[in-house]
Amino acid sequence: MRLWPVFIVSVLFHAYAGLRLLPALSGDAWGLFGPTWPVRTLAAVLVVSALSIPLGLLGHRLGRQPFAELAMRALTWVGLLCMGFFSSLMMLTLLRDAALTAWWGAGVAGFQASALTAGEAARLSASAVPLLAAAVTLWGFVNARRTAAVVRVDVPLVGLPLALQGFTLAQISDIHVGPTIRRHYLRRIVQRVNSLDADVVAVTGDLIDGSVAELAHQVAPLADLQSRHGTFFVTGNHEYYSGAHAWIKELRRLGLTVLMNEHVVIEQAIRSGEGSSSGAPAPSGMSASLVLAGVTDFHAAHFDPAHRSDPADALAGAPPGLPRVLLAHQPRSADAALRAGFDLQLSGHTHGGQFWPWNLFVPLQQPFTAGLNRLESLWVYTSSGTGYWGPPKRFGAPSEITLIRLVAA
């Protein structure tokens, strides 16, 4: 990856923001000689941000060399924080430009009711933009770094056997262990998942951002995940960026079952004290089974043709008539899952947009952004993700650990 184009793009975008905001704050044509500390502070922040974003990307690369790891990780943190701040600053600057244009147009047309002069409106809005961007970034950082909350979702399935009433799947997705998400962050997630006492733990991809050599120690807490029937994993696109074959081997070593276009049949005995919907006690020893399948990432074939994602293949040889649950990283697998005959698909990938305004663009690529949705007879639950990617920032799309409970329709 060549970084000089990133430097050029970063400088150009920051220059635009500076030229739109600094003159309004300072009163001079270029906004560089304002006497007030807000002008100097914003100018300094823009310079640091313009340099830190590409240097942060460079730091992620050089951090692979042990001698530079701590310094480069610090540089990566600064760069990603600046990226989060500037993304909000840039969008708010563009919205400010649009609002001022509309305000000016209303005045020309004779509809302006505000007592503010053009200079006052420009100065007040230029002051508000960086303050609002900083507030959003700070709140987003707090949201991103705290342990994901548990979201409980009931999914009604037609003909669900009595022994599967209340069957639970704890879903975690898109943790992105890497430069800023480390072992202690993952350990907190594991502890919260274990407290749910789920029947199954499902990890729906994008677990890591880095190689096994870099991150094996950081993902070790996954070995402590506990559930009645085990932990199941499917690959996401980021596993393929980071060496999917090595990660599949490592996760299996940790005790996870990696489903590569394949399925398992899970038999569930009725829980003690449960009865039928009429209130009568259930017969002793009653049990039922469900099919839990998993597919490789939607785009896995771009990296390895042998990993082509195929929900139909994942069901090959499965017993007929059982409830069928699919783990698929991207919601885009839903069409194929519907054709294959699944009842429920658990996905991630979207992060729920992670922070505004990126949530507005998710529908351009994926059929669902977040939450429980229906595609004809198929239920699709899309997790907003348990970690984050890139900037440590979540705003309007909180991270989650999802506890899916199957109930009779």
Name these PLM-found stretches:
Residues 1-146:
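Non-catalytic terminal accessory segments
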Residues 151-152, 156-409:
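Soluble catalytic domains of enzymes that build or remodel membrane lipids, polysaccharides, and related
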